[in-house]
C-alpha cells in the first residue's frame, strides 16, 4: 500500500494533516531542517506531535537534513536519543556522516535519504543503502522509466515528491542563495545556523526568482530574467506511480497556511483512495480531479508568491556586522 507523507510546520498543521488523511507526517526540529525556524518545532513540540500522530495511527518522522560539522554531531545524537525514546518512527537525513552515526547508534530506526542528498543514479542509492538508508527521495528530474529501473534493481524504498519545486540546478546543491547573502549565528546549544543556506540550518532566499538582467560584456541582452524554480503538483502520474509500486508519495509545504496544506493532503488522500478502489483494467478518469487541483494550485501560487516576495526583500538587506 502506498503511503501518503504530509508536512507539518507547526502543531496545528500536525492536527490538520491527520484530519486530511496522511499516513505519515514529517516535522523539522528547530535549526536542523531545511526551513526557517518559524516552520520548525521545538523538541517538546516534536514530542507532542508524536503523541498526536500515534494516537490516530499515523507515523511521525523528523527531518534532520542539514549538513553538519563535527562539533554538531554530539548534539544531534543527543536530540535523536530523545526522539527515539519518545517513539519517533523515522529520520529524514542528508549528511552521510550523520546518517552513519545514527544508524550505528539506533540500528532499528528507519532512515530516509532526503531530497537534499540529491540522489541521481543507482550507485548513489547503493551507497546510501550501505550506510543504513532504507528509503530514498527520488530527484524530481527522474523519469518513470528510471524510477522503475531503480526499484527493480535495488532493495530500497522509493519516495516521490508529488508537490514540490523543480530547481534549475539540483535540490540540495544550489549555492546561489548563500553566495548572495549569508548570515551566521549560533543557537544556545552550539548549533551553527547559516541564514541563507538551507543546507546549514538556514533558509533559501529564492534569489533565482529575482528579476535578473542578462549581459554580455557591456551589452544587455535581456531583462527581468527569472531562473527556473517552478512549483508543481503531480496528477497524471499518480496512477502510474501507484502501479509501479512506489512506497511513498510526499507533499512538501511546511511554510504554507495550515488550511491550504490540509486541502492538499485531503485532495491526494481522496485521489489515491479513489484509484485504489477503481476496477482493475478500466481507465481511470482524472478529468474531475483537474478542476479541484486547479483551485488548490491557485491558492498555493498566491502563498508561494507572497513568500518569495518577502524572502527577496530580506535578501537585499545588509548582513549585520558581527
Spell out what each predicted region is.
Residues 139-141:
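Output/docking surface of receiver
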Amino acid at each position: 500500500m502506498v503511503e501518503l507523507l504530509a508536512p507539518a510546520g507547526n502543531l496545528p498543521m500536525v492536527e490538520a494533516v491527520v484530519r486530511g488523511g496522511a499516513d505519515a507526517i514529517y516535522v523539522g526540529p528547530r535549526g536542523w531542517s531545511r526551513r526557517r525556524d518559524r516552520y520548525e518545532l521545538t523538541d517538546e513540540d516534536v514530542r507532542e506531535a508524536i503523541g498526536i500522530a500515534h494516537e490516530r495511527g499515523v507515523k511521525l518522522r523528523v527531518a534532520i537534513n542539514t549538513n553538519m560539522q563535527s562539533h554538531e554531531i554530539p548534539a544531534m545524537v543527543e536530540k535523536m536519543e530523545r526522539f527515539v525514546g519518545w517513539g519517533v518512527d523515522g529520520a529524514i537525513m542528508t549528511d552521510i556522516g550523520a546518517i552513519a552515526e545514527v544508524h550505528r547508534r539506533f540500528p532499528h530506526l528507519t532512515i530516509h535519504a532526503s531530497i537534499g542528498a540529491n540522489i541521481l543514479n543507482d550507485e548513489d542509492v547503493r551507497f546510501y543503502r550501505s550506510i543504513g538508508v532504507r528509503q530514498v527521495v527520488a530527484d524530481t528530474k527522474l523519469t518513470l522509466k528510471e524510477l522503475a529501473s531503480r526499484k527493480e534493481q535495488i532493495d530500497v524504498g522509493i519516495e516521490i515528491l508529488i508537490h514540490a519545486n523543480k530547481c534549475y540546478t539540483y535540490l540540495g546543491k544550489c549555492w546561489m542563495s548563500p553566495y548572495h547573502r549569508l548570515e551566521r549565528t549560533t543557537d544556545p546549544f552550539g548549533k551553527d545556523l547559516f541564514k541563507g543556506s538551507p543546507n546549514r540550518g538556514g533558509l533559501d532566499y529564492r534569489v533565482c526568482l529575482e528579476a535578473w538582467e542578462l549581459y554580455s560584456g557591456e551589452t544587455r541582452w535581456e531583462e527581468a530574467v527569472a531562473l527556473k524554480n517552478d512549483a508543481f503538483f503531480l496528477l497524471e502520474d499518480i496512477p502510474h506511480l501507484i502501479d509501479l509500486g512506489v512506497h511513498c508519495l510526499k507533499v512538501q509545504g511546511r511554510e504554507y497556511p495550515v488550511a491550504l496544506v490540509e486541502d492538499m493532503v485531503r485532495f491526494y488522500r481522496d485521489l489515491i483512495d479513489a484509484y485504489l478502489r477503481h476496477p482493475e483494467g478500466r481507465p481511470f478518469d482524472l478529468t474531475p480531479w483537474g478542476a479541484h487541483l486547479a483551485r488548490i494550485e491557485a491558492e498555493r501560487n498566491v502563498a508561494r508568491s507572497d513568500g518569495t516576495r518577502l524572502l527577496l526583500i530580506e535578501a537585499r538587506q545588509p548582513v549585520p556586522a558581527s
